[in-house]
Amino acid sequence: MKRPAARWGVGAVTIAFGVLTLVAGGRVLFGDGAAEAGDYVPFVVWFNFIAGFAYVAAGVGLGLGERWGAALALGLAIATLVVFAAFGVHVLSGGPYEARTVAAMTFRAALWCALAAWGYRLIRRDRYA
């Protein structure tokens, strides 16, 4: 890849996002964060916590410019959109939720769609360079 600084910058930010996701989700699931979280939706928190490990791996892959990093980012984008849709069904059926969950899932979906597109663009560009 021709832009290692950009790759590593994106990789580092992605890894940091994964670590923060693990810490935040872990606090809600295993610590004292449940009281602060309010009406959190358990399947969303579990998904985000488990996905946090994949976020770290995707950050490494994207930082290295590996095809599997872009593929993992795409998989995370799709999985996040599926969970977001399930969350929407939960909300529309009258389930309790926090408004910040809507914002967080919107951010996560947009982030992973952008990272997947960025990763594939760089891989494709390097293949034909």
Language-model-derived ranges and their functions:
Residues M1-A129:
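Topology signature of small-to-medium multi-pass alpha-helical membrane proteins
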